[in-house]
Amino acid sequence: MGKNVVVLGTQWGDEGKGKVVDLLTERAKYVVRYQGGHNAGHTLVINGEKTVLHLIPSGILRENVISIIGNGVVLAPDALMKEMTELEARGVPVRERLLLSEACPLILPYHVALDNAREKARGAKAIGTTGRGIGPAYEDKVARRGLRVSDLFNKETFAIKLKEIVEYHNFQLVHYYKEAAVDYQKVLDDVLAIADILTAMVVDVSELLDNARKQGELIMFEGAQGTLLDIDHGTYPYVTSSNTTAGGVATGSGLGPRYVDYVLGIVKAYSTRVGAGPFPTELNDETGEFLRKQGNEYGATTGRSRRTGWLDIVAVRRAVQINSLSGFCMTKLDVLDGLKEVKLCIGYRMPDGREVDTTPLAAEGWEGIEPIYETMPGWSETTFGVKEHSKLPQAALNYIQRVEELTGVPIDIISTGPDRDETMILRDPFDA
């Protein structure tokens, strides 16, 4: 029986991970975020009530679940407090259910200022970041100058370290980017005001997870963003700053890599992308607008409209390889309802005429690529809210089967609407 399950996106994010994690955590004891920060936007709909989480794991609404923010996550204290306050106002006892790794790097105002200054300076070459300081915080981590949650235990030392790093970043902000300096005293006061709240939630995450594993507890790891945004394996440089793939679980939580039992890849029935970067199947026509409107494709974090296109099997196959996927959950199948035909990208035609069935690595390699499509009949019947596999339209079943054939991975879960119960679990990852 699988006990440790990873849930991650197979595309460019926004696949519907939050809903699936929330659904499957009915059985889990722990839900762990292992990378990213509050640039994620995980939307849950339970009995018609919508909740958008950015930093706190999607298991927080379950009474039986302990939610953990692992060391691979960059943590913005102000964003965490805002999210905690909103949830507590709705009666969710966050402080009883949420734990933090002391090794989480902190995102502070100078990271946000740098993020926005750089995007502004890039002009037409902007990456399309969320402007929340994620990249600069990871830079400080790798440069070994960043502050971490553990630094909050000694406030005097924290103040000294903070002064040094504020001076360092302010020099760059003022003299290179010609932007305003960050106020050291305000940053210090704001962080110290909530330091005790954060340190009270600190645990040894690696030890906790290892003990839970030994006791046979069910653990779920919640990925943010998507495989094709991975810092190493994504469409570089149009990527995020963390490892969004299954490999990030071990480094971002402290669980040994051999202890992952099942990797669930969330795949949207079509493709979307927010921000700049390659997108071979993008549709800038009526069909693209149809998908955007029907799928309500607007970012949960930024509110930006998402780019839309047909499902790219070539890119998804790359996700299968990198993540050693055990199964898929297909989301938003209902968005395709009403289309006369649906298409799957099964290969790329390169600028020199060659046909390939693998993805390039760097963004430059995607330039001039044309998708090669396989066209299938669409369906006029609704799939929205359907909860039995046999009651799906035959054309929709054919589409699902073809995705399985082309990827070599079974679709174990099908989502037909935003609500928790608008889902078919054909094979439970915890039992696989």
Swiss-Prot record:
Originating organism: Yersinia pseudotuberculosis serotype O:1b (strain IP 31758)
InterPro entries named in the record: Adenylosuccin_syn_GTP-bd, Adenylosuccin_syn_Lys_AS, Adenylosuccinate_synth_dom1, Adenylosuccinate_synth_dom2, Adenylosuccinate_synth_dom3, Adenylosuccinate_synthetase, P-loop_NTPase
Cofactor binding: number and manner: Binds 1 Mg(2+) ion per subunit.
Gene3D superfamilies per the UniProt record, alphabetical: Adenylosuccinate Synthetase, subunit A, domain 1 (3.40.440.10), Adenylosuccinate Synthetase, subunit A, domain 2 (1.10.300.10), Adenylosuccinate Synthetase, subunit A, domain 3 (3.90.170.10)
Alphabetical UniProt keywords: Cytoplasm, GTP-binding, Ligase, Magnesium, Metal-binding, Nucleotide-binding, Purine biosynthesis
GO BP terms, alphabetized: 'de novo' AMP biosynthetic process; IMP metabolic process
Chain sites annotated for binding Mg(2+): 14, 41
Domain of life: Bacteria
Catalytic reaction list: IMP + L-aspartate + GTP = N(6)-(1,2-dicarboxyethyl)-AMP + GDP + phosphate + 2 H(+)
Keyword Signal: no
Keyword Metal-binding: yes
Lineage: Bacteria, Pseudomonadati, Pseudomonadota, Gammaproteobacteria, Enterobacterales
Protein family per UniProt: Belongs to the adenylosuccinate synthetase family.
Quaternary structure note: Homodimer.
Listed name of the protein: Adenylosuccinate synthetase
Chain's gene name: purA
SMART domains in the cross-refs: Adenylsucc_synt (SM00788)
Pathway: Purine metabolism; AMP biosynthesis via de novo pathway; AMP from IMP: step 1/2
Record: residues binding IMP: 14-17, 39-42, 130, 144, 225, 240, 304
